[in-house]
Amino acid sequence: MESGNVVNVQSELSGIIDGSKSYMYEQLWKLCAGPLCDIPKLGEKVYYFPQGHIELVEASTREELNELQPNCDLPSKLQCRVIAIHLKVENNSDETYVEITLMPDTTQVVIPTENENQFRPIVNSFTKVLTASDTSAQGEFSVPCKHAIECLPPLDMSQPIPAQELIAIDLHGNQWRFKHSYRVPRGDTTGWNAFTTSKKLVVGDVIVFARGETGELRVGIR
């Protein structure tokens, strides 16, 4: 419904805003994207540069996109509002990217914005730069004691060899099983080699673990 040049797009957005991803997915995605990744918020005003977009597409596809050149004279920049944000990951890798849907801000648009005061579950996480021993075929992934205590489920230290199975979910929704045991140092052994082989991890890659309040464990790479 339109009134006085004010448009409420709540109903249209209900099918556009990506609510299929969990809060843990969002947090892991941001950790994998890294601290330099800055994403606008839902409802924010941004500028869209048509010519710059075309040039980026040409550079990524290595093809000239003359058919995309507009027949009319577009301004160098268009003021828009962010109406949808989708945090995604490449199918054949763990490279993160974001799809942002914009609406030209030609009217005063009422768009649902993020509630900064809403409850946010606590998520503990840690990152580690992989070493040669972490990525070797005979190696294991050693977790610093501080990170293991903060981010991993507690071990039963009354056992002769405290150990447990961890199930962690990556950004693709795949489950990975690791054996977490207390030794010197603590290590994730069984299942780790399968993970490093599948992800093609090398020295210098960064692994990310995140655990929510409910105990849900997530794993990713940067």
From Swiss-Prot:
The entry's DNA-binding region feature spans 126-222
- Any matching Pfam family: B3
The scientific name of the source species is Arabidopsis thaliana
Q: Which gene encodes it?
A: ARF23
Q: What does this protein do?
A: Auxin response factors (ARFs) are transcriptional factors that binds specifically to the DNA sequence 5'-TGTCTC-3' found in the auxin-responsive promoter elements (AuxREs). Could act as transcriptional activator or repressor. Formation of heterodimers with Aux/IAA proteins may alter their ability to modulate early auxin response genes expression.
What Gene Ontology molecular function terms does this protein carry? DNA binding; DNA-binding transcription factor activity
- The superkingdom of the source organism is Eukaryota
Put simply, this protein is called: Putative auxin response factor 23
Q: Where in the cell is it found?
A: Nucleus
